[in-house]
């Protein structure tokens, strides 16, 4: 039968062939049995095989009929659907004829749709997919793409003949194929024709359809097409063209029923806008889509997304060629004309910049354009601009009820974000925030996104002045960053000039124009505008200034500038004088600018112009132009284009007599260059002299401007160039002409240098307005002096050098006594000579020719001192009854040991040098011995002295104790100087006892001798100490007395190293006063105990211990003094003379205190002493002598300090004179009288001077008269010695009178008298006393200007010319006289330079505590207090007393008395001084100020100080190698402050949180994490701090993940997300290992894993819904992607490169905007991160090294999208889908497994 059928098939008749197919079908059914379905496993019968074979026949009738037969078998249920379909698909690849097969597939699909769709009630879209169960047509097309015409034919028939009831199902079953055809990423060209042709078929209008709504089929097709649009590829020209056609066709179809398709039309309009941009970039054409948009506007009207499209149009216009602009302009006009109430949206102002760009370029472009119908581009642009300028704006922004979920390009995200930001920026504070953020990003941005330019232009056009200055600033900086948009901005600025504004704003806009000349291409445009302005006569001055500014940017404008300057010189009759004046000033200013900017290029060209202006402007009211050109000349001289001397020679005829203040000021500024341009020629030196004279003359000018300029110019000159001849006559001292100057010698050799004190006299001549300039001048003097300060001055000041300016007579005393000592043969004279030797023994130092000491002679000198020391220990006489010697003997030993120690030390070093020279020692060994020589000498002297005292008399032991105590002080000072030299602690030497232990041993020895019950803590110098078996002290009375008085020598050591001993010693000495239970049995010892306590207290006063100690120490001092005074005035006590002397010593030093309480106390006790003298007639002569001496000392000190008046002092002096007259043989009375006369004389008491002139000749006459009684002669000797200042050390008098030649003559006369007595007198006792007094006088004369304190109390050791010394003297005067006599304003002028220069230099040693304490306590005001503290702070490093005083003022109660500014300074400067005060003081400062200011409830709570406190704390924590205790305190303070900071962060307080983060930055990770641990109560501040640390790279990014688990449960998660967004962006900007791209990528991948765990509920959270938690985490993911993809999105969003833009809260007052992350701008920024995520993700994954992780990102997106339904909100799912679709340009997306999954197939 098969053969028969075959023959029928071959018969060429269609009827026969058709019948044959019927027979074949019947045969198939017969062979297979009618009851069984044909399926895959059915036996292949001949008939069935033939049927399949003929389906591919070349005969169209046969193959068609066979294919239809197969379909019929399926339809009649004789064959399985899958069997037939698969069979057909198997045939397709190999057959030549596919028509029948494809038609059969269509029929099968229609049948399947009918069967499965149930009449459209069931969705059958999922029957087929694209990949796993592919649609049959996809399979066919992939195998036979050449069959596309058959496809087109069959698909056309399929859709056109689709039964109405099957329309929905048919579209659903065809959907996978259509998705594949149009969305396949490769967009194969083989399918292109099918795509295009089929689209017309799909979208052709239905002939019979309802006018109101489309047919079901049309609805289904159009909805499918709308869904396809976001997946279209727009990468290249072909793809873009196809996509454009697709979207346009879809839009046209939608427009047939605009009401029905309103939402889709709106969305497609936006898609069309987006794809227009791509089309414009790739094809240069977009008019068709623009016309479509215009049609949509007409139909949609108010439903059209006007504002978004306006933004899009603005962007398009900026990049559209002229030929494409007309349609866009028409569209814009249409958009603005369809708005209701004729009110246009404010966003229309965005069009201003593009419109102006068109208008400004029309003339050129119209030349090359083809004539077109209708209005021209220019007319359209003008119409549009006119419409926008009507300012009839809608109040509200258009509300969008729709949003494109999946836009076809990234443009939509940009315009939507721009629209949202524009919406918020109606508030000026939000606009200011955005501008500040943009400004912060410009330095790191190379290309500025066009939307940002548009927004800026919008702000520029709209702003009425609130933010205009900021906008112009950002515009300028934006032009610097990206010059490509400058041509667009220039017309906007010109447009803004036409709007009504404040005049100053017009000026700002005009001067912004030249700043935009950042590229040569922009210059022409700007130049034309400026030239246009110049055509208006009134604007020519401004034009010249603008041209000059433009020239500063681009030198190529110089010819034009020159031309315009020349034109401006031409006089014009049409303008008034005012305009001419403006032109002249403008020209002068331009000359100045040219000279300043490019002096070498064009400076020479300006000389003629400068000369012209100077010649023309000579009138008083023409000073301004002349001054301006002189400033230009200043620049030329500075650049050395012209010679300043030659210039002045040329100008001086015109200007030397000029009196105009402005000219004089400018000339002074010009002359400030003279020092820096110095030339080594006589002419220049003469010129400099002339200039100095000019400047000094004008310092006294009545005009403050001139005087200020003169002083400021003088500050540039060297201090040595000023002479006393320059000073004003009123303060000019007499020229010192030396007596020895011969007549024929040159007078130029006279010293004309200015004494430092003379500069201070300028204060009295200087008006208040000139004081600041004088202050600058003083600062210059101080700085120069410190720069040139000899290094040796620091050491000599600490060691105490001898005065070098004493007369020859005084200098000859030591040699005289030494000679007497060496030639003496009288044993009775030996003790006296030894005493004299003690006071003044010294051996001259010999130097080689090159000025270096000779080692051999140094060694010899050291040996001489060693031998003399041992001799003096044995020979110096100690007599307990000699009260006068007891006072001075300790000081004599101290002075001697100072000389001896340094001489022996130098000798030791000399010996070592000799050993090295002779090769007796190795260099290393010698070096070690030299470094330890100071300790070797100490121990050698200690051994020698203790051995000498071992078995000798009590006198020797007493001398030894005084010598060792002095040695302790001397070595301690030497150690201090070594420490300052080595800038730190000295290295511990293992072979020597440490200084601390050695000093402790000496001290314990003294204390054990004074008090046998004292328990020493270490070893003792056992040679001295003998204790009986009963435990009683067996030391001699002399030893006990010497030990007690020696304690006073150690006061400087106590204060520096062991202040705690002071209380112990005071208590010990007080307990042993006469009349006390513990008083010594020996009467002499009781006397010395009182004296010792007085000496000890006086030394404490001298060291200003009360100023640098706490309240407890002051109370103890007063308590001890009270006890001493009680003994002094207790008439029942017999042995209280020592107490009287002690009180005298204390009161003498207390007089110099600035505390009113002390001064009152001194005055009261002085009167009490005076009365006591009156009542002492019945007392012993010694008692009376002591009392008189004490009264003289206290009276002198009180008068010198201004405590008593001259009359009261005179009364006391007369009282003592009467005592002397009544008892002329009493030495004590004569001593007292001589002392008071001397003291009052040097303090300016005229009557005392007169009395002294009478007393001295009388006493000398008594001494030199033969036969005078010895006692009378002795009294006269004491009196005349006192009369020339031998007792000055007791009172520490300071006076210039001591240095007068008159006084020097009296001193010489006394010395000659004493030497004559010693040489001639035959009375041993008289000789002995005379020698002792001569030595005593020598020592007191040498130390008259030196303090015994551990550091000098002033700078008298500096030369007379020292300004610093004079300034410190002024401090002292201020401290003594108070603000009534020394005005604070003048004191500030002197103090400020000292404080300012002190920041860079350490001053020579001085007792800052003594200087500054009075100024701090007296009412000088806040400014002086702060300057005092500044000096303490800067000098605390090198001055222990400055640090001690500072320690007092930074702790309660004194710190509470300081002003707010002073506290602020202390807080900020804490890092400079905090290491130099005690731990207790640091604690007090930290607790009572640094932390207290953060406590709102605290009385100290002060928000103004909080930033300063944290700044100081953070800087203090950066100090290198802090002590453990200090670090602990600072760390603890950081924790406390962090806890006190509010959780919600106010914008104005942001700096505090940054500062606390900087503190944590210095800590270890564990400490920082402990303090900033994130909890629910502190989450915002802790999160911010951690985020800041992460952004700076201090913490790794992984810390964020831990924080997120807490953040997700926070109610205001958005605030935290906003912080995270900024932190992540800043982490990208900061260059750090922890924020590098690999670290960031690692963290983001980890975060993605964490989010996956959350989505699949591997991680759960309490009190937070899963979908909300996932939304938050996806937001965080989005922030990271947007922040790290590029700089465009962050710039548009208003992200900042730092936190500073958010620091100032400049919005309207309100609780929400004032907090960080809560303002409308902040919220929009965060929301729009999600909008920009898709585009940012695509950008990120195209960069290295991110692109390597693309597959991981895609897989992750799929895993989250496919998470359980309840885990992901609809919005998040849409976002992730859009993100996936944005990746369709990537190679990884083109894998079928990826893109089919992404499209949902």
Curated annotation (Swiss-Prot):
InterPro entries: ARM-type_fold (IPR016024), FOCAD/RST1_DUF3730 (IPR022542), Focadhesin/RST1 (IPR045163), Focadhesin_C (IPR021392). GO terms for biological process: regulation of post-transcriptional gene silencing. The keyword Cytoplasm applies. The keyword Protease does not apply. It is found in: Cell junction, Focal adhesion; Cytoplasm, Cytosol. It is linked to Liver disease, severe congenital: An autosomal recessive disease characterized by severe neonatal liver cirrhosis and progressive hepatic dysfunction. Affected individuals have feeding difficulties, poor overall growth, and failure to thrive with signs of malnutrition. Additional features include jaundice, abdominal distension, hepatomegaly or hepatosplenomegaly, and ascites in most patients. This is Focadhesin. The gene is FOCAD.
């Amino acid at each position: 039968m098969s053969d028969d059928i075959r023959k029928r098939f071959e018969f060429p008749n269609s009827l026969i062939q058709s019948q044959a197919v019927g027979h074949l079908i019947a045969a198939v059914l017969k062979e297979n049995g009618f009851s069984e379905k044909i399926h895959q496993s059915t036996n292949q019968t001949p008939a069935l095989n033939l049927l399949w074979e003929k389906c591919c026949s070349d005969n169209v009738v046969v193959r068609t009929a066979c294919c239809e037969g197969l379909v019929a078998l399926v339809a009649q249920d004789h064959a399985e659907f899958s069997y037939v379909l698969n069979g057909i698909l198997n045939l397709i690849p190999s057959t030549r004829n596919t028509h029948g097969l494809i038609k059969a597939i269509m029929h099968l699909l229609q049948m399947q749709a009918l069967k499965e769709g149930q009449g459209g009630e069931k969705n059958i879209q999922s029957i087929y997919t694209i990949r796993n169960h592919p649609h049959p047509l996809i399979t066919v097309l992939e195998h036979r793409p050449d069959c596309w015409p058959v496809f087109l034919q069959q698909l056309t028939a399929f859709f056109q003949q689709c039964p109405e009831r099957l329309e929905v199902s048919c579209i659903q079953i065809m959907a996978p194929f259509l998705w594949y055809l149009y969305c396949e990423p490769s967009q194969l060209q083989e399918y292109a024709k099918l795509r295009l042709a089929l689209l017309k078929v799909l979208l052709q209008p239905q002939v019979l359809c309802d006018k109101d709504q489309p047919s079901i089929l049309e609805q289904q097709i159009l909805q499918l097409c709308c869904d396809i649009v976001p997946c279209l590829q727009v990468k290249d020209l072909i793809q873009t063209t196809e996509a454009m056609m697709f979207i346009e066709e879809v839009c046209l179809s939608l427009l047939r029923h605009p009401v029905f398709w309103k939402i889709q039309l709106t969305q497609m309009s936006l898609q069309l806008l987006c794809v227009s941009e791509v089309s414009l970039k790739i094809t240069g054409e977009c008019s068709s889509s623009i016309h479509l948009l215009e049609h949509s506007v007409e139909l949609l009207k108010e439903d059209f997304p006007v504002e978004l499209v306006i933004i899009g149009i603005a962007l398009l216009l900026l990049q559209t060629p002229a030929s494409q602009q007309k349609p866009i302009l028409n569209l814009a006009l249409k958009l603005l004309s369809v708005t209701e109430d004729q009110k246009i949206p404010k966003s229309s102002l965005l069009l201003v910049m593009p419109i102006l760009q068109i208008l400004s370029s029309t003339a050129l472009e119209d030349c090359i354009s083809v004539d077109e119908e209708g209005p021209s581009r220019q007319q359209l642009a003008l119409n549009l601009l006119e419409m926008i300028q009507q300012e009839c704006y809608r109040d509200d922004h258009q509300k969008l009820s729709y949003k494109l979920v999946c836009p076809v390009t990234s443009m939509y995200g940009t315009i939507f974000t721009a629209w949202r930001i524009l919406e918020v920026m109606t508030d000026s504070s939000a606009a200011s925030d955005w501008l500040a953020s943009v400004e912060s990003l410009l330095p790191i941005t190379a290309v500025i996104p066009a939307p940002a330019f548009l927004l800026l232009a919008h702000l520029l056009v709209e702003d009425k002045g609130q933010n205009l200055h900021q906008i112009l600033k950002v515009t300028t900086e934006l032009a610097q960053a990206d010059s490509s948009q400058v041509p667009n901005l220039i017309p906007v600025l010109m447009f803004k000039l036409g709007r009504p504004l404040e005049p100053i704003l017009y000026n700002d806009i005009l001067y912004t124009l030249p700043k935009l000349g950042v590229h040569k291409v922009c210059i022409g445009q700007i130049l034309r505008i400026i030239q246009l302005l110049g055509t208006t006569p009134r604007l020519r001055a401004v034009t010249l200034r603008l041209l000059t500014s433009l020239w500063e940017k681009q030198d190529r404008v110089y010819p034009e500038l020159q031309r315009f300057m020349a034109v401006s010189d031409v006089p014009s009759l049409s303008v008034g004088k005012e305009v001419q004046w403006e032109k002249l000033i403008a020209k002068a200013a331009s000359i100045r600018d040219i000279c300043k900017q490019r002096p070498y290029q064009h400076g020479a060209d300006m000389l003629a112009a400068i000369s012209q202006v100077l010649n023309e402007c000579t009138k008083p009211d023409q000073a301004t132009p002349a001054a301006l050109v002189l400033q230009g000349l200043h620049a030329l001289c500075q650049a050395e284009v012209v010679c300043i001397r030659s210039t002045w020679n040329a100008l001086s005829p015109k200007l030397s007599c000029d009196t105009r203040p402005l000219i004089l000021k400018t000339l002074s500024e010009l002359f400030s260059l003279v020092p820096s341009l110095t030339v080594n020629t006589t002419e220049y030196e003469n010129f400099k002299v002339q200039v100095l004279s000019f400047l000094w003359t004008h310092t006294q000018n009545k005009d403050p401007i001139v005087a200020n300029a003169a002083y400021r110019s003088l500050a540039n000159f060297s201090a040595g160039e000023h002479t006393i001849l320059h000073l004003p006559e009123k303060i000019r001292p007499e020229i010192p002409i030396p007596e020895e100057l011969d007549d024929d010698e040159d007078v130029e050799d006279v010293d004309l240098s200015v004494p430092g004190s003379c500069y201070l006299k300028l204060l009295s001549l200087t008006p208040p307005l000139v004081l600041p300039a004088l202050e600058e001048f003083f600062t210059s003097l101080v700085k120069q002096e410190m720069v040139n300060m000899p290094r040796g001055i620091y050491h000599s000041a600490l060691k105490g050098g001898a005065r070098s300016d004493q007369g020859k007579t005084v200098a000859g005393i030591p040699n005289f006594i030494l000679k007497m000592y060496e030639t003496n043969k009288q044993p009775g004279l030996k003790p006296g000579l030894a005493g004299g030797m003690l006071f003044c023994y010294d051996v001259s130092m010999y130097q080689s020719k090159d000025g270096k000491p000779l080692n051999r002679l140094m060694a010899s000198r050291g040996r001489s001192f060693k031998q003399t020391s041992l001799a003096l220990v044995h020979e110096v006489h100690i007599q307990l009854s000699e009260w006068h010697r007891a006072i001075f003997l300790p000081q004599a030993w101290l002075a001697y040991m100072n000389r001896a120690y340094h001489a022996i030390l130098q000798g030791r070093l000399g010996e070592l040098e000799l050993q090295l020279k002779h090769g007796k020692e190795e260099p290393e060994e010698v070096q070690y011995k030299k470094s330890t020589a100071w300790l070797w000498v100490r121990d050698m002297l200690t051994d020698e002295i203790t051995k000498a005292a071992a078995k000798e008399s009590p006198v020797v032991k007493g001398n030894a104790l005084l010598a060792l105590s002095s040695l302790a002080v001397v070595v301690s000072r030497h150690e201090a100087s070594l420490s300052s030299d080595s800038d730190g602690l000295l290295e511990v030497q293992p072979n020597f006892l440490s200084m601390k232990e050695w000093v402790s041993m000496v001290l314990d020895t003294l204390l054990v001798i004074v008090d046998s019950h004292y328990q020493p803590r270490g070893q003792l110098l056992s040679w001295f100490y003998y204790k009986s078996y009963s435990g009683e002290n067996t030391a001699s009375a002399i030893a006990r007395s010497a030990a007690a008085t020696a304690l006073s020598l150690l006061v400087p050591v106590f204060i520096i190293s062991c202040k705690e001993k002071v209380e112990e010693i005071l208590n010990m000495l007080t307990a042993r006063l006469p009349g006390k239970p513990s008083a010594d049995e020996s009467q002499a010892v009781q006397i010395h105990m009182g004296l010792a306590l007085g000496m000890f207290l006086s030394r404490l006063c001298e060291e200003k211990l009360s100023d640098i100690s706490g309240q407890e120490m002051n109370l103890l001092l007063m308590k001890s003094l009270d006890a001493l005074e009680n003994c002094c005035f207790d008439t029942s006590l017999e042995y209280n003379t020592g107490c009287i002397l002690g009180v005298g010593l204390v009161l003498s030093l207390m007089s110099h205190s600035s505390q009113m309480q002390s001064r009152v106390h001194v005055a009261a006790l002085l009167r009490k002493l005076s009365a006591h003298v009156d009542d002492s007639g019945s007392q012993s002569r010694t008692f009376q002598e002591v009392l008189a001496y004490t009264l003289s000392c206290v009276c002198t000190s009180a008068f010198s300090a201004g405590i008593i008046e001259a009359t009261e002092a005179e009364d006391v002096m007369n009282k003592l004179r009467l005592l002397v007259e009544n008892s002329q043989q009493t030495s004590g009375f004569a001593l007292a009288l001589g002392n008071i006369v001397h003291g009052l004389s040097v303090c300016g008491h005229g009557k005392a001077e007169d009395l002294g002139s009478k007393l001295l000749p009388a006493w000398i006459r008594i001494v030199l008269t033969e036969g005078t009684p010895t006692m009378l002669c002795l009294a006269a000797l004491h009196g005349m010695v006192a009369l020339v200042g031998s007792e000055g050390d007791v009172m520490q008098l300071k006076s210039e009178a001591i240095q007068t030649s008159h006084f020097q003559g009296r001193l010489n006369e006394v010395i000659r008298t004493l030497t004559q007595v010693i040489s001639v007198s035959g009375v041993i006792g008289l000789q002995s006393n005379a020698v002792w007094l001569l030595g005593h006088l020598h020592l007191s004369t040498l130390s008259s200007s030196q303090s015994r304190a551990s550091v000098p109390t002033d700078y008298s050791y500096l030369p007379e010319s020292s300004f610093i010394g004079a300034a410190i003297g002024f401090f002292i005067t201020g401290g003594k006289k108070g603000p009534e006599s020394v005005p604070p304003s003048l004191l500030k002028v002197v103090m400020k330079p000292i404080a300012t220069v002190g920041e860079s230099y350490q001053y020579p040693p001085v007792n800052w505590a003594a200087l500054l304490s009075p100024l701090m306590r007296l009412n000088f005001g806040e400014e002086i207090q702060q300057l005092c503290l500044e000096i303490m702070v800067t000098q605390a490093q090198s001055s222990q007393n400055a640090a001690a005083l500072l320690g007092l003022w930074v702790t309660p109660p004194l710190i509470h008395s300081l002003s707010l500014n002073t506290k602020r300074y202390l807080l900020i400067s804490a890092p400079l001084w905090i290491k130099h005060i005690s731990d207790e003081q640091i604690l007090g400062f930290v607790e009572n100020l640094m932390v207290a200011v953060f406590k709102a409830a605290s009385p100290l709570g002060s928000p103004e100080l909080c930033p300063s406190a944290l700044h100081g704390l953070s800087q203090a924590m950066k100090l290198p190698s802090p002590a453990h205790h200090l670090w602990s305190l600072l760390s603890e303070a950081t924790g406390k402050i962090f806890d006190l900071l509010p959780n919600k962060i106010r914008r104005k307080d942001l700096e505090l949180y940054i500062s606390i983060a900087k503190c944590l930055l210095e800590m270890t990770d564990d400490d920082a994490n402990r303090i900033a641990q994130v909890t629910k109560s502190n989450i915002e501040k802790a999160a911010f701090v951690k985020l800041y640390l992460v952004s700076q790279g201090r913490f790794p990014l992984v810390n964020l993940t831990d924080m997120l688990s807490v953040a997700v449960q926070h109610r205001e998660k958005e605030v935290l997300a906003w912080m995270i967004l900024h932190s992540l962006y800043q982490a990208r900007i900061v260059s750090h290992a922890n924020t590098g791209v690999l670290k960031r990528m690692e963290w983001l991948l980890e975060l993605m894993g964490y989010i996956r765990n959350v989505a699949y509920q591997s991680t759960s959270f309490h009190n937070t819904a899963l979908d909300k938690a996932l939304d938050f985490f996806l937001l965080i993911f989005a922030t990271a992607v947007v922040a790290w993809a590029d700089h465009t999105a962050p710039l548009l969003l208003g992200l900042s490169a730092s936190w500073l833009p958010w620091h100032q809260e400049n919005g309207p007052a309100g609780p929400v905007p004032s907090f960080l992350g809560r303002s409308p701008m902040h919220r929009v920024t965060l929301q729009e991160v999600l909008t920009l995520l898709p585009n940012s993700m695509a950008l990120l994954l195209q960069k290295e090294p991110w692109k390597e992780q693309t597959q991981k990102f895609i897989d992750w997106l799929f895993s989250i999208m496919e998470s359980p339904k309840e885990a992901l909100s609809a919005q998040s799912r849409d976002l992730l889908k859009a993100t996936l679709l944005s990746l369709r340009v990537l190679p990884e997306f083109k894998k079928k497994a990826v893109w089919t999954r992404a499209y949902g197939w």
